[in-house]
């Protein structure tokens, strides 16, 4: 079970923009998150050839080298994805969090975090809604018959996590991500289907 903690809410925690995306933070924190994504990119680079990693070649409003997808027939709102991997099992929709310190997930699915160097637990936004938005857009692009595997990846090497079993979405540390992907259930897609899905996703990339 997740540890018993005292929750202390702090100002400016969990801010969201009007479109539901997390509010843009300071450049230092943006760079911190980018470092975590880069670390996961390196892990994915070593996957076997049967897996296709979607290239980060879009330009966004605040950063470049991202995956930015839009399906105007479904919604006029684009979504930025951290990582997408297509394999025989389906599409892995990976959301990366570069948290240091300690993370606990309680039985209700709430996230609690003690940042490195601090002594109090604070409420942290569960990324489940963000992952859900990405999943729905992805389904509109590839079709609802294609398996989509949602994953939350914790990329910082020093993160300590408890209560992973309380998350409906698998929470996987970076050093175990490749093993999770390679050994995830039996294959259902052919190499031709994997290539077709890659082309379809790439056709929905945009830059702003």
Model-derived features: positions:
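Conserved hydrophobic "DFG−1" position in protein kinase catalytic cores
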Residues: 85-86
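Surface-exposed interaction regions that form or flank ligand-binding interfaces
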Residues: 1-79, 89-91, 100-105, 111-208
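Cell-envelope/extracellular polymer assembly enzymes that use nucleotide-activated donors
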Residues: 82
């Amino acid at each position: 079970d997740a540890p018993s903690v005292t929750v202390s809410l702090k100002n400016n925690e969990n801010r969201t923009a009007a479109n539901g995306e997390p509010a843009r933070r300071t450049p230092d924190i943006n760079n911190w998150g980018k470092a975590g994504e880069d670390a996961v990119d390196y892990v994915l680079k070593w996957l076997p050839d049967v897996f296709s990693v979607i290239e980060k070649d879009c330009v966004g409003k605040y950063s470049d080298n991202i995956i930015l997808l839009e399906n105007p027939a479904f919604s006029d709102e684009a979504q930025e994805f951290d990582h997408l991997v297509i394999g025989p099992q389906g599409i892995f929709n990976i959301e990366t969090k570069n948290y240091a310190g300690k993370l606990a997930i309680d039985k209700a699915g709430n996230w609690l975090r003690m940042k490195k160097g601090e002594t109090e637990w604070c409420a942290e936004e569960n990324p489940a809604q963000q992952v859900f938005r990405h999943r729905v857009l992805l389904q509109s692009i590839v079709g609802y018959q294609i398996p989509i595997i949602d994953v939350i990846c914790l990329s910082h090497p020093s993160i300590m996590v408890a209560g992973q079993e309380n998350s409906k979405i698998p929470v996987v540390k970076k050093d175990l991500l490749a093993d999770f992907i390679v050994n995830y259930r039996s294959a259902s897609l052919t190499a031709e289907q994997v290539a077709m899905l890659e082309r379809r996703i790439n056709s929905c990339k945009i830059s702003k």
